[in-house]
Design a protein with these regions (language model features):
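Domain-level signal for soluble alpha/beta catalytic cores
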Residues: 1-147
Length: 147
């Protein structure tokens, strides 16, 4: 048997409930948040508001269902969530609405797995401004905090 949460809530607003579930249940627990930055004021992705300066007309009063793009979590937020959930003993992990292959790879790698898609992880050591590789010219690295 598996008990858990799927959909509606993003990582930030799902985690408190998962902690409570884990305290009282010893069975398998699942966690599949939506890939959106829900918060205390907007705990589900159905009522997220875009407060980042969108001035265009949208057909709804909230970003759901067709204007959620700027509300998405990044890979590091999903990775942090997956690692924290895994450390709580939650081992049925994933991402619901808004998921993509990169995020699923991030979930897997955050709990120590190497999956076939791991070969596509970016190699930042060769990035033209932020790389550490000896072949990245110093004058390019100097642009990192100015570009």
């Amino acid at each position: 048997d598996v008990v858990g949460m799927n959909c509606f809530r993003g990582p930030e607003t799902m985690m408190p409930y998962l902690k409570e579930i884990r305290k009282v249940l010893k069975c398998h627990v699942a966690a599949l948040p939506v890939n959106f930055r829900t918060n205390e004021n907007n705990p589900t992705f159905f009522n997220l508001l875009d407060r980042n300066g969108c001035t265009c007309n949208t057909p709804h009063t909230t970003t759901f269902p067709t204007a959620l793009d700027p509300m998405q979590c990044n890979r590091y937020e999903i990775g942090k969530f997956a690692k924290e959930a895994y450390e709580l003993g939650i081992n049925y992990l994933g991402v619901c609405c808004g998921a993509n292959p990169m995020l699923i790879r991030e979930v897997a790698e955050s709990v120590g797995l190497k999956v076939p898609a791991s070969k596509y992880r970016e190699n930042m050591s060769r990035h033209f401004m932020y790389g550490t590789h000896s072949r990245v010219p110093k004058h390019m690295k100097n642009y990192g905090d100015k570009a």
